């Protein structure tokens, strides 16, 4: 580099250092993209901009990547280590320098032809200042490339809203070997890079925003809304103009009013807020979503719903991943001042709890949702319908998902892909309110005062987790499961073909399974799981560390799913972090520390335990079986678990099929044997008395679930002809009784939805005949197996209410030594 150029770059770098604070995507490009800093790198930028180049250089030096200003010297030839695909617009248009990118690509390919050992990494990088999508009808296209003067003002105003996006590298060795090294290939490389950057920019900025009134006019002109307006006028005996005004009022209620400036401002506020409230936001598998957006997919984000914080957290994470924040379906209860107008400008559109009896509303909402898809906006909705009060996934509500498929049946949309997302917290600000509601308190309506009270409580929230699950492309799903789905395409009428409801139900279930597959274990939910399993919700520090180590080894060595994330910290580090959250008490004596979960916190902590209950349910069940039988064959263990697995699968959205269950159990058994929690004697699995304490704590994780199943099966066995409604009601009453008598703190223990799912599963599995009567011999077999795993006191409580005397004379469980840390039911 010449001396003058060095001086020029140094002078230009001075204002950039002050004005530019760019984010790098992904956060750790070396590990996430598999970059090798020891190999030569050719940086490829979309167009000639010295500001972009110096911004890139700052990030490269921060990431320990080669300096893009230092040329590469290969075989005695010196070539620039960066290349601009386009020259870009000029302030003085009469001077257009010669395009160098094709020549430089050709020179590099030539070097590979002459040196078989050479393999240069071609690394595409885009630098963006600001992400305003622009408005429809404005003269300047929103994807324009800036000239020098425009870039100066962009840096001045948007320097702190800039990002450097690294993409996956391309091996020039592979290009040379597979495609050759002539100039045609160099031209092709430049053309592909140009397309890559164009798609990437569209993914980051999104389509132009319509004027709100223009959008309403377009919706009013749609055939479906015209018909709904006419029906409204006829059914309510009002004028056509009045019916049309009703439709516009509904559009005003529903539609978002997205503003890039509001997003920019909220990013500043949220960045400040997260840094003070959270100790970190952990994001996993975001590259999947970036790739989908770049490939032109219409993305529908379907996260689990833990807290009102979910809306803000997910939009914040997506914005920092270089993606457009989605349009979010929010409950109409959030449309209060000032939250409603703010959320609306951040992309929220509002949805009522029910559409029943209002055809005009359902038509307007469906057409609005379809218009979002047609225009290419990403959309987010919570398939659970509302926030989970128990920490488990709720049964999915399928209305909006059904409308998503109906939007596909209008034709003309881009490929729609559902992206399940697990959102997890170490502290949920509403958890105290959830506990009150589960005890029967009336849900308080959202308002400004409630919001201010909630904000006042925000402090020390620990870590947050956003894990992107395995995407579910709708076209691929429909092609596989409903090959004839395109026959139902109709651009005017909303279609409800016979296959729609079964397909939507299956899709909803798959979404929930994939959300659970992407679960994040953390310090809070692991410590809560261990302490809630213990006798008096207390363990010595050594016992708790031993149990945390047991959980961590299980999750690492026999992982639940490839998308599940497990902390990379030691048990000691996790415990210290959890203690700093001020949820637990520490009592010190001359022997050592005792970690205590206070009684008033116990119900609240079940929420966090339930977040990861599905990850440990099968190991807990194996532990419970071995604890009772003391020695059991693998075949017998598999038979017993197979009887109740369908119930667990339906309740907890487990991903293993019946066919996968034997192999899964073998893997878990091998890991439990490796930890010496059980002894594998070849044909039999045997209790290991030396490690009975951690095995007992592990077994406690499934105890309440099995008790709940035993309640329902005991009622079915005693009264085979009981109807479904009565069975669910009686089960809940008995569960409440059991929870009072035996000190069960879990609020989901007598949850109505849990028993509804259980009864539906029993019918599907053939325990209840088509006539509605239970098949007593089947229900009794499972009940007897379950009751053997319970303490005599719990068993007696259940049978004293439900079971006739002749069916309740099963043998007692053999006595087991009761070490410190055993749980009482």
Curated annotation (Swiss-Prot):
Tell me where it mainly resides.
membrane
CDD domains according to UniProt = LPLAT_DHAPAT-like
Q: Which reaction does it catalyse?
A: sn-glycerol 3-phosphate + an acyl-CoA = a 1-acyl-sn-glycero-3-phosphate + CoA
| Region (Disordered) location | 803-825
Involved pathway(s): Phospholipid metabolism; CDP-diacylglycerol biosynthesis; CDP-diacylglycerol from sn-glycerol 3-phosphate: step 1/3
Question: Which superkingdom?
Answer: Bacteria
| Locations listed in the record | Cell inner membrane
What EC number(s) is this enzyme filed under?
2.3.1.15
According to the UniProt entry, where does the motif HXXXXD motif sit in this chain?
305-310
What is the enzyme's main class? transferase
A single GO CC term for this protein reads: plasma membrane
Q: Which GO terms describe its biological process?
A: CDP-diacylglycerol biosynthetic process; fatty acid metabolic process; phospholipid biosynthetic process
Does the record's keyword annotation contain Metal-binding?
no
Q: Which UniProt keywords apply?
A: Acyltransferase, Cell inner membrane, Cell membrane, Lipid biosynthesis, Lipid metabolism, Membrane, Phospholipid biosynthesis, Phospholipid metabolism, Transferase
Q: Which GO terms describe its molecular function?
A: glycerol-3-phosphate O-acyltransferase activity
Q: Which Pfam families match?
A: Acyltransferase, GPAT_C
UniProt keyword Transit peptide present: no
**Bilayer disposition of the protein:** Peripheral membrane protein
- Which HAMAP family is this protein grouped with? Glyc3P_acyltrans
For this protein, the record's NCBIfam families field holds:
plsB, PRK04974.1
Q: What is known of its domains?
A: The HXXXXD motif is essential for acyltransferase activity and may constitute the binding site for the phosphate moiety of the glycerol-3-phosphate.
Matching PANTHER family: DIHYDROXYACETONE PHOSPHATE ACYLTRANSFERASE, GLYCEROL-3-PHOSPHATE ACYLTRANSFERASE
Q: What protein family does this chain belong to?
A: Belongs to the GPAT/DAPAT family.
Q: What is this protein called?
A: Glycerol-3-phosphate acyltransferase
Q: Which organism is it from?
A: Yersinia pestis
Which gene is annotated as encoding this protein in its UniProt record? plsB
